[in-house]
Amino acid sequence: MTDLHRLSIRELAKGLSQAKFSSRELTEHYLKRIAKIDPQVKSYVTVTPEQALCEADAADAALKAGNATALTGIPLAHKDIFCTKGIKTTAGSKMLDNFISPYDATVVEKTKAAGLVTLGKVNMDEFAMGSTSESSYVGATSNPWALDHVPGGSSGGSAAAVAADLAPFATGTDTGGSIRQPASFCGLTGLKPTYGRVSRFGIIAYASSLDQAGPMARSAEDCAYLMNVIAGHDAKDSTSVKKEVDDYVANLNNTSVKGLRIGIPKQYFNVAGLDAEVKARVEESLKKLEEMGAKLVEIDLNMTEAYVPTYYLIAPAEASSNLSRYDGVRYGYRCENPADLMDLYKRSRSEGFGPEVQRRILIGTYALSAGYYDAYYVKAQKVRRLIQQDFLKAFENVDVIAAPAAPTTAYKIGASLDPVEMYLGDIYTIAVNLAGLPAINAPVGFDKDNLPVGLQLIGNYWSESQLLSIVHQYQQNTDWHTKRAAIAEENA
């Protein structure tokens, strides 16, 4: 079959269980597509054909023996921030260019246990710091919808791989929008779960109180299948929460859009820099939900102006602490011929980290320094609590909150925006991480240049099933999620 890449996860699972095709055939199909198409997209940093085919053969044996799970034999790609035993894990950095993890991240462990086949590792912004995937040490990834545009970040490789049909779904991480924004830029569905819903064990840390892993796929249904695998408590992650996990696939039709109260924050739709076409597409999608029976309720989120300064004190502060472990001594990049120990530290870090990572380490170190700790970091944590309370107050009157996932569509590679401009572009996504809430992006149309636009829905704690269900029903009534970039239509 030449069009296996056009099948949904449900259709792939059905085809495998009915022996219409084997996992080996499916895996070979994707490997051929990667070999032909990815040199243009540059989504993968490491492709693992031998391991993938070995896992596919094991999946076929399990399917034949009747020992298969719902997803046995289906391929996926992992963001290169998840530790993978025996496979290089770089986090997009020269610092970890030759790092091979001795263990699997819990998310990877769970996908293997479910019989999923790892195609390889996909590109990302260095240490997940960025919104374009341009800061990666191996080079920029292209947006399949326009190869001279960025796919977003930091999970840009995950988004590009799925959008180009080089993987049926992929794992991502979201510290301030890194699943939702690239999903928006590439016309995909992407879910950032509640903090603590998915294990962080084995994820190379950026900001520990903000990082969360989640699925990226074409549809809410496809995301639900992957959430069923990766969600759940993990004793190896102290921030993982002991809470019963929903059957996200079974719950896809459990939330009625009829009567659903969708909060429309006044402040969000009056942000300077919100593109008129993005605003129009988002408003059209909300009108569609209203036609389906939802009720649009105008709300206030009065802390909106505090999002960016608060996030860009807390996240860099945590990053400066987490990244202090990379000193050239135990693992990671080591400079050549250091004069002494201090020279080893200084040069290894200066040469191993890229400019954006260095910038955030400097900001974070400054915020944590003795003279400024109370004035900046402690104050930011207090404001963080106010942002959380702002959301909780809103949820007393609405079920979900709607917003754009990004103020613009994808911009051109090398546009070299001012860092502050880039930070301001995160305004719609970062508060969700500060509050620890779940949120989802759904594709809702295109701008005049045929670049995708995304709608973000923010839910209350542990409402992943509700968010997936709302988007699933929206996708039953629209076809934006089925649209494919021209490059994805190519056959290997």
Swiss-Prot record:
Q: Does the keyword Nucleotide-binding apply?
A: yes
- Tell me the active site: 79, 154, 178
State a GO cellular component annotated for this protein. glutamyl-tRNA(Gln) amidotransferase complex
InterPro entries annotated for this entry?
A: Amidase, Amidase_CS, Amidase_dom, AS_sf, GatA
Entry EC no(s): 6.3.5.7
Alphabetical list of SUPFAM superfamilies matching this protein: Amidase signature (AS) enzymes
A Pfam short name: Amidase
Q: Name one GO molecular function term.
A: ATP binding
Q: What is catalyzed by this enzyme?
A: L-glutamyl-tRNA(Gln) + L-glutamine + ATP + H2O = L-glutaminyl-tRNA(Gln) + L-glutamate + ADP + phosphate + H(+)
Q: Which GO biological-process labels does this protein carry?
A: translation
Q: Which HAMAP family match?
A: GatA
Its assembly, as annotated, is: Heterotrimer of A, B and C subunits.
Family of this protein = Belongs to the amidase family. GatA subfamily.
Report the protein's function: Allows the formation of correctly charged Gln-tRNA(Gln) through the transamidation of misacylated Glu-tRNA(Gln) in organisms which lack glutaminyl-tRNA synthetase. The reaction takes place in the presence of glutamine and ATP through an activated gamma-phospho-Glu-tRNA(Gln).
Name of this protein: Glutamyl-tRNA(Gln) amidotransferase subunit A
